[in-house]
Amino acid sequence: MQLTPREVEKLMIYTLSDVAFKRKARGLKLNYPEAVSIITVTAMEGARDGKSVEDVMKEASKVLTKDDVMDGVADLIPNVQVEAIFTDGSRLVTVHDPIK
């Protein structure tokens, strides 16, 4: 199977988010890459589900709280940008202050 670099990157993000969701379910605090992957996948899946850009941004900004992440991680993530595939094409989604 031949994958483009973008497809490989998406697979890595989805794989990391799967691990991160499992760790979160076990009550572990997430590190920086885990937190970013969950926010990113939430935005990408919301877009794939047919939600609007605004709804995707709102949902992705509510998926994690400061209690879900290690100390200082929330301060390291002022925003997350992801190119998501919506029903009408791909768009850049910016999630501001994703961890509150």
Curated annotation (Swiss-Prot):
<dbReference type="GO" id="GO:0009039">
    <property type="term" value="F:urease activity"/>
</dbReference>
<dbReference type="GO" id="GO:0043419">
    <property type="term" value="P:urea catabolic process"/>
</dbReference>
<comment type="similarity">
    <text>Belongs to the urease gamma subunit family.</text>
</comment>
<protein>
    <recommendedName>
        <fullName>Urease subunit gamma</fullName>
        <ecNumber>3.5.1.5</ecNumber>
    </recommendedName>
</protein>
<dbReference type="InterPro" id="IPR002026">
    <property type="entry name" value="Urease_gamma/gamma-beta_su"/>
</dbReference>
<comment type="subunit">
    <text>Heterotrimer of UreA (gamma), UreB (beta) and UreC (alpha) subunits. Three heterotrimers associate to form the active enzyme.</text>
</comment>
<comment type="pathway">
    <text>Nitrogen metabolism; urea degradation; CO(2) and NH(3) from urea (urease route): step 1/1.</text>
</comment>
<dbReference type="GO" id="GO:0016151">
    <property type="term" value="F:nickel cation binding"/>
</dbReference>
<keyword id="KW-0378">Hydrolase</keyword>
<dbReference type="InterPro" id="IPR036463">
    <property type="entry name" value="Urease_gamma_sf"/>
</dbReference>
<dbReference type="InterPro" id="IPR012010">
    <property type="entry name" value="Urease_gamma"/>
</dbReference>
<dbReference type="InterPro" id="IPR050069">
    <property type="entry name" value="Urease_subunit"/>
</dbReference>
<keyword id="KW-0963">Cytoplasm</keyword>
<dbReference type="Pfam" id="PF00547">
    <property type="entry name" value="Urease_gamma"/>
</dbReference>
<dbReference type="GO" id="GO:0005737">
    <property type="term" value="C:cytoplasm"/>
</dbReference>
